[in-house]
Amino acid sequence: MAILKLTPSCKDYLWGGSRLRTDFGIKSDLEPLAEAWVLSCHPDGPSYLPDGTTLADYVATHPEALGTDCAKFEQFPILTKFIDASNNLSIQVHPSNDYALKNEHQYGKTEMWYVLDCVPGAYLYYGFTHEISKEEFAERIKNNTLTEVLNAVPVHKGDCFFIPSGTLHTICQGIVVAEVQQNSNVTYRVYDYGRVGADGKPRALHIEKALDVTRRTPPQKHDFGSHLAQCEYFTVDAKKGAFDGAADEKSFVSLLITDGAGTLTCGGETVKVKKGESYFIPAGSGKYAVTGDCETLVTVV
């Protein structure tokens, strides 16, 4: 098959809402519904093919489906999510590959956010307003004044943020994003608003590790040309309306329908697609075409 529709694993983190269900058609009984892992081979939340096979099992038996550009990675390289932040996420940071492999036995996390919708006045935290010392960073975590030196950025639908590992960040309330990231689930929380988890205990913080890995400077500006984001792990583009492309021998293609509806054609197959759906086109499948009044996030390695 040249077109593989994926069903996500979902997460009920306490800051989630209901929009992934009501607005994006994600089928889940979880409440709240915080995340849908729409392209995932991660054991913490795999995506599934229509026959119930995990995407991880599929690529294990069809390694050629990944493409030659994936050969440099020891595992499936990326993970894509829908995220509905009904409340603020924790202020957090992700480690580099070197630090994460040494301390967590998995890869670090560089990621990008594409804002799908947000309430008026929405903002997020993205790095620092100015460079601070490690000592000041630790002290501000301790006395709950960290947000005074964080870079609060107003957001609007269609905005994109590239977040290299080591960047302190958080999505704040009222924002829905599509996130493309390295295939990792390592997060170090530095502040969580005093919230407690389902067990009634405060959620764990990881301050010492965060002090080790955080880049304590303003975020760098990135110019990706015509792409939303591009790095050694992924290249992401946003398409509106009809377009075509190709899944060549170098990489699989991930198509995430972020709005509207249409059709997807590849390898003699044609399927109807709509908002909230995720499709995997194996490497080497050749030309594909999307038609209709839809918006699509296209990711390759």
Question: Could you tell me what each predicted segment is?
Answer:
Residues 1-132, 187, 192-217, 236, ...:
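Transition-metal
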Residues 131-143, 249-263:
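Short, basic/aromatic beta-hairpin or loop at an interaction surface
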